[in-house]
Amino acid sequence: THALMAFDFPAAPDWLAEGLASLYEDCRRDSGGRLLGETNWRLPVLQQAIRRRHLPSLGQLMDGETRAADARLWYAHTRYFCLFLQYRNRLGPFYRELRRGRSGSEALARLYPDASPAQIDGEFRAWVLQLR
């Protein structure tokens, strides 16, 4: 994944490059041959952070404010944010918006025009907590 990112989107933010790379740690192919990420061992780390109210916002993640704080949590957060977008068929469009030079917040606003950043973050957290 890293080699493909370096070719297709060399300016990709670290959180996206690592989120996509870790997304495919556990994956399957759908009937059309497309790779789809699935839940994996990183899920409990993320769920625990949400329950303890220790998870930074998606805005903080995309702004690069969180990587040094807790690497395990950072990787889980980036991975499951990509999985969240994948489940909603927005991962490809989100990637393309970023590649066009939009920030993560701008890309989310284009894909979720009727939702605030806080609403998207809340939807993400609720979705993560229901995963098994």
Regions found by a protein language model. Name each.
Residues 7-132:
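Acidic/His/Gly-enriched intrinsically disordered linker/tail segments
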Residues 1, 5:
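Short alpha-helix carrying the canonical HExxH Zn2+-binding catalytic motif
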